[in-house]
Amino acid sequence: MSITAERKAEVIKTNAKKAGDTGSPEVQVAILSERIANLTEHFKTHSKDNHSRRGLLKLVSTRRSLLDYVKKKDEARYRALLEKHNIRR
């Protein structure tokens, strides 16, 4: 259900603004989007896994909060994030 360290490093590398950037909202949203996608695939075969569903809702909520922060700071960055990660809003 969680992403591997290699996949996480790859996601960080493709979304980082500079080397060593792991805390920017763009990187955090990318990591959360990857984890959400993995959980969504998990639920296709384990539809009654309500314990993991609660975790999914928490991840979505955290991503939503980060996106709201980015939208408040810079609308263009927000739109780019939505487009890049195919997030509906």
UniProtKB/Swiss-Prot annotation:
Stored InterPro entries: Ribosomal_uS15, Ribosomal_uS15_bac-type, uS15_NS1_RNA-bd_sf
Similarity remark: Belongs to the universal ribosomal protein uS15 family.
PANTHER family: RIBOSOMAL PROTEIN S15, BACTERIAL AND ORGANELLAR, SMALL RIBOSOMAL SUBUNIT PROTEIN US15M
GO cellular component: cytosolic small ribosomal subunit
Xref: Pfam families: Ribosomal_S15
Protein name: Small ribosomal subunit protein uS15
Region listing for Disordered, in residue ranges: 1-24
GO molecular function: rRNA binding; structural constituent of ribosome
Record's keyword annotation contains Ribonucleoprotein: yes
Function: One of the primary rRNA binding proteins, it binds directly to 16S rRNA where it helps nucleate assembly of the platform of the 30S subunit by binding and bridging several RNA helices of the 16S rRNA. Forms an intersubunit bridge (bridge B4) with the 23S rRNA of the 50S subunit in the ribosome.
One GO biological process term: translation
Compositional bias (Basic and acidic residues): 1-11
Organism: Afipia carboxidovorans (strain ATCC 49405 / DSM 1227 / KCTC 32145 / OM5) (Oligotropha carboxidovorans)
